[in-house]
Swiss-Prot record:
Function text: Methylates large ribosomal subunit protein uL3 on a specific glutamine residue.
PANTHER family with a match to the protein in the record: 50S RIBOSOMAL PROTEIN L3 GLUTAMINE METHYLTRANSFERASE (PTHR47806), RIBOSOMAL PROTEIN UL3 GLUTAMINE METHYLTRANSFERASE (PTHR47806:SF1)
Protein EC: 2.1.1.298
Keywords annotated in UniProt: Methyltransferase, S-adenosyl-L-methionine, Transferase
Protein name (Swiss-Prot/TrEMBL): Ribosomal protein uL3 glutamine methyltransferase
GO molecular function ontology, one term from the record: protein-glutamine N-methyltransferase activity
UniProt-listed CDD domains: AdoMet_MTases
Pfam families hit by this protein: MTS
Species the sequence originates in: Neisseria meningitidis serogroup B (strain ATCC BAA-335 / MC58)
Length: 303
């Protein structure tokens, strides 16, 4: 029935306005989850249409009444159908994901960038890192697409950055993005599990590790099932990876070095597990309970 409807759309719809309305109706009908870039059916449909037609992503209105060629219409409707029927996140259909002013290549080898950490780099880490030039060596654990490593290179122009992931597939995607930004000389991609085998020390360590607990993994919307499970689940309480980071980070931080970790909705569980650690919870667009900061000295119990 759905495929018949799309065939009918190909025959009867003519303008971008027509196809936008059709897409929004189909997305709502399909009960899609929006959380990988947009938060509603209209914006998702507009993005997919504009991207597929190679139009500016911020200029929908001037093109609403433009008629499409049959080949263009076929291509746009094919993308809309895949989003509606297969629940594939838009970023995997376009192979593009945005974080702030940066865009990255993505595919199903990596999770779609959505960490709040990027909002905190630079000014957001003062007074712990008073000047960006004080960061000479930085580490991105669980780098995935390499998005945070690339943004660290932007904010900390004097820094050499190690970007680590246990997934070779993810590192291949990170390599594409590092090359796209011309940062091969500043970002080193390393295949390892967290700190294993690392020898350097760092002024800043950031990580957006897996943090979804086992029960929540089973309840994730269908869209998340297209993402690598390795990058989502982290044990019964979602803290397996974070525990390893807290156990080892101090050994890899320079004096006054900073650890920045995102943990999703696990703040209460984490604080209950580590009552002795003086976590600082930083304000992001998602709230103040998603990203914590600790210094090397705090991890060692020296302050």
């Amino acid at each position: 029935m759905v495929h018949i409807m799309f065939n009918q759309a190909a025959q009867e719809l003519t303008t971008i306005r027509d196809i936008l309305r059709f897409a929004v109706s189909r997305f709502n009908e399909a009960g899609l989850f929006f959380g990988h870039g947009t938060d509603n059916a209209h914006d998702e449909a507009a993005y997919l249409i504009l991207h597929t037609l190679n139009l500016p992503l911020d200029m929908l209105a001037p093109y609403l009444d433009a008629k499409l060629l049959e080949a263009e219409k076929e291509e746009v409707l094919a993308v809309i159908e895949r989003r509606a029927v297969e629940h594939i996140p838009a970023a995997y259909l376009t192979h593009q994901a945005w974080q702030g002013e940066f865009d990255f290549y993505v595919d199903e080898r990596v999770i779609i960038p959505r960490s709040f950490i990027y909002e905190l780099l630079g000014d957001g880490l003062r007074p712990w890192i008073e000047y960006d030039e004080l960061v000479h060596n930085a580490l991105d654990l669980c780098t995935g697409s390499g998005c945070l490593a690339i943004q660290m290179a932007h904010h900390y122009p004097d820094a050499q950055i190690d970007a680590v992931d246990v997934s070779l597939d993810a590192l291949e995607v990170a390599g594409i993005n590092v090359e796209d930004y011309g940062l091969e000389e500043r970002i080193r991609l390393i295949h390892t599990d967290l700190f294993e085998g690392l020898e350097g020390t760092y002024d800043l360590i950031v990580s957006n590790p897996p943090y979804v607990d086992a029960e929540s993994v089973e309840l994730l919307p269908e869209e998340y099932l297209h993402e690598p499970e390795l990058a989502l689940g982290s044990g019964a309480d979602g803290l397996d990876a974070t525990r390893q980071i807290l156990l080892n980070a101090a050994k890899f931080l320079n004096p006054k070095g900073v650890l920045l970790v995102e943990i999703g909705h696990n703040r209460d569980v984490l604080e209950a597990a580590y009552p002795e650690l003086p976590f600082t919870w930083l304000e992001t667009s998602g709230g103040d309970g998603f990203v914590f900061l600790l210094t090397r000295e705090q991890l060692l119990g020296e302050e």
